[in-house]
């Protein structure tokens, strides 16, 4: 009998080993969730979880004791337990990472909580979820388990179809989705292998590895230029076609100006007026007029397309514009906020056509002092459409059409600019990367577009008009409350980011003031931007400096604009391509012309928030389209060698920006195989463990183009020693 007992004990030990602690913890937690309203006795738990051996029962009691210590369950009576519902369930947002390190961000802030893939309940990035929170156990990170998906953030995905006989998959590069989407044959909408498609996830059964979806739209063949541009728009949830019903409504708007409209407006048709725009522009939002009033006194008019005269509040065109909130400028096309008939014809301030405008009129001295300003509805007629290049040539050669007017405006703009910088405005003088594209949309060359005097001339008068409009509404006596109005606001830089910037530039031998008055700091930033001009680190330091700044946004709560050093600022000058400018036009008319009462703060703040978020999405889509063209451009240049500079350092590798064309690619850390490299976040570098070699942000480096992945919009480089 003793022999038999020993065998039995051995068997029990084996059974005890068979179930790991981790598995039992999971089984217990799942069981408590299923029976969350019941009190469970120890005996009942043993029975239901088939814990028949002594070691397993002991392990179970240890875990129950830990869960009780962690306040996850309560021992309501001796050996009787109940799930604790207080404080262990939280609502928030699920964040999915491509490396499986998913997390949960609690509503109302708080530290992220790790959610293992097995506990994610197929949640997708951005989903609003409820989790059960396992408090910290000895030596273990706090963990959460998704117990309910409250709201899907995104259920449509863009990818490439792979079609088999009776089913298909959508293969997506979206890193927030762990698996491809399964599509039944009857839900394919005629899609074929190699088609780019938009697919909606309709269900994701508990036990299924893949979500199940249906095709919403076929965009075209992968690799085709229009298909790829539409795919980028769809990825960001932006529309790629214009609704026919809205186009139809625009077609009914008459282009003729009725006689009674002339009578209501100031007439500027006989005053020298012109537009200055990019050479490929069709939507001319703004025009400038100039005339001499008397010695040392000039009248300058900033005339803006009177879009809201044609687009009435609440109309079908207005609702579409509100939803879009901005035009989107991809690398080879514009996705307009308004129907084409309005933005390129009726509202566009085209030469030799009479147009309705909303204008800011200034009386200015030769020294740039503003003696008077008014905001009025006008009728104008542009005499000439200049490209920036043409206007620039007149400024440089002092010869050409309307040279006196252009040179006068240029001189006044330079004074306004000088005053702005003296007041503490920050001078980020960035160039843009542009592609020359053939008729098929293929990039054939890269060029840089920098801001010259002609651009700065237009910019200064737009800033002046925007500021003046904001002051007219916002600047009121202390005893009065200003009427509700959308402002363009920009907060002070984050002090921690400024400190990081200061430490970063020190290695290049530059200094930065991070404390003192607002103006002290901004002047110090300008000083830095001047110092780096023409240096090889210019682009890099400028990029890092911009990252230290806050993002400008729209709000009815005015805090001023730090970057421009204005106490009051708004957007008034681009109503063809920005919805906030349309709001500003409507409110100006209501307040200034009609003496109307203030509008709802809540409603307009919501419109401001929506516009700010759409502006960000549009900027991200624009960047993605540039990235796509960069990768496409470099596909033809595989194996070629380029000089560049390290533009980013992460734990997975080095980002390198090429000097010649500003294309950015990555050297994966796995390819740096001469040592084991560790990421030093504080010093923006990778450091070799044995040889101590470092690769730092800003280092000059030579690379070879190794791989180009258009699907991922990703370039891989190889280091050349």
What are these regions (language model features)?
Residues 4-301, 308-353, 632, 685-686, ...:
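Charge-lined substrate channels and their catalytic hotspots, especially those that engage the 3′ end
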Residues 111-116, 177-183, 662-679:
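A short macromolecule-binding patch
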Residues 507, 678, 683:
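Basic, polyanion-binding surface patches
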């Amino acid at each position: 009998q003793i022999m038999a007992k020993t065998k039995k004990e051995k068997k029990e030990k084996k059974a005890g080993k068979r179930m790991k602690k981790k598995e039992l913890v999971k089984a217990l937690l799942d069981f408590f969730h299923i029976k969350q309203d019941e009190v469970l006795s120890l005996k009942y738990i043993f029975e239901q979880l088939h814990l028949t051996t002594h070691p397993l029962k002991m392990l179970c009691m240890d875990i129950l004791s830990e869960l009780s210590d962690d306040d996850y369950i309560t021992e309501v009576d001796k050996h009787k337990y109940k799930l604790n519902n207080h404080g262990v369930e939280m609502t928030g947002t699920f964040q999915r990472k491509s490396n499986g390190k998913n997390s949960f961000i609690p509503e109302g802030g708080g530290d992220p909580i790790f959610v293992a893939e097995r506990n994610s309940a197929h949640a997708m990035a951005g989903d609003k979820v409820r989790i059960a929170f396992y408090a910290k156990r000895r030596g273990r990170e706090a963990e959460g388990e998704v117990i309910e998906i409250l709201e899907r953030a995104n259920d449509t995905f863009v990818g490439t179809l792979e079609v088999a006989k009776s089913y298909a998959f959508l293969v997506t590069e979206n890193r927030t989705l762990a698996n491809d989407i399964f599509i039944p044959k009857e839900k394919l909408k005629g899609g074929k292998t190699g088609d780019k498609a938009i697919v909606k996830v309709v269900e994701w059964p508990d036990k299924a590895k893949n979500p199940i979806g249906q095709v919403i739209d076929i965009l075209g063949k992968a690799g085709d230029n229009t298909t790829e541009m539409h795919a980028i728009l769809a990825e960001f949830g932006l529309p790629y076609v214009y609704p026919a019903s809205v186009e139809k409504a625009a077609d009914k708007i008459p282009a003729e100006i009725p006689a009674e409209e002339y009578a209501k407006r100031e007439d500027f048709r006989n005053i020298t007026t012109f537009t200055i725009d990019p050479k490929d522009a069709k939507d001319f939002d703004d025009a400038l007029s100039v005339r001499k009033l008397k010695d040392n006194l000039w009248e300058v008019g900033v005339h803006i397309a009177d879009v809201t005269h044609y687009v009435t509040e609440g109309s079908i065109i207005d609702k579409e514009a509100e939803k879009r909130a901005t035009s989107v400028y991809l690398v080879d096309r514009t996705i307009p906020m308004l129907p084409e008939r309005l933005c390129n014809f009726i509202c566009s301030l085209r030469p030799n056509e009479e147009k309705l405008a909303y204008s800011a009129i200034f009386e200015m001295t030769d020294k740039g002092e503003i003696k008077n300003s008014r905001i009025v509805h006008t009728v104008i007629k542009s005499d000439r459409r200049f490209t920036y290049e043409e206007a620039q040539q007149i400024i440089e050669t002092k010869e050409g059409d309307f040279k006196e007017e252009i040179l006068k405006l240029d001189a006044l703009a330079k004074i306004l600019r000088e005053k702005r910088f003296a007041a503490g405005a920050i001078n980020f003088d960035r160039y843009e990367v542009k592609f020359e594209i053939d008729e098929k949309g293929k990039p054939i060359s890269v060029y840089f577009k920098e801001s010259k005097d002609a651009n700065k001339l237009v910019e200064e008068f737009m800033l002046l008009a925007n500021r003046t409009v904001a002051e007219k509404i916002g600047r009121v006596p202390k005893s009065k409350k200003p009427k509700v109005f959308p402002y363009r606001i920009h907060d002070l830089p984050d002090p921690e980011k400024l400190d990081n910037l200061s430490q970063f530039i020190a290695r290049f031998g530059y200094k930065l003031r991070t404390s003192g008055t607002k103006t002290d700091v901004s002047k110090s930033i300008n000083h830095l931007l001047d110092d780096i001009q023409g240096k090889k680190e210019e682009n890099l330091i400028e990029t890092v400096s911009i990252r230290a700044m806050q993002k400008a946004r729209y709000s009815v709560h005015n805090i001023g604009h730090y970057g421009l050093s204005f106490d009051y600022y708004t957007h008034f000058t681009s109503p063809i391509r920005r919805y906030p400018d349309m709001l500003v036009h409507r409110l100006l008319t209501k307040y200034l012309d009609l003496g109307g009462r203030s509008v709802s703060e809540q409603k307009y703040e919501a419109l401001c928030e929506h516009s700010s978020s759409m502006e960000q999405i549009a900027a991200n889509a624009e960047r993605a389209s540039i990235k796509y063209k960069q990768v496409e451009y470099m596909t033809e240049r595989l194996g070629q060698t380029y000089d560049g500079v390290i533009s980013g350092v992460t734990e997975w590798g080095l980002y390198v920006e090429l000097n010649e064309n500003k294309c950015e690619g990555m050297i994966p850390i796995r390819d740096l195989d001469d040592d084991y490299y560790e990421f030093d976040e504080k010093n923006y570098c990778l450091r070799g463990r044995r040889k101590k070699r470092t690769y730092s942000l800003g280092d000059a480096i030579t690379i070879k183009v190794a791989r180009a992945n258009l699907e991922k919009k990703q370039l891989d480089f190889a280091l050349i020693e």
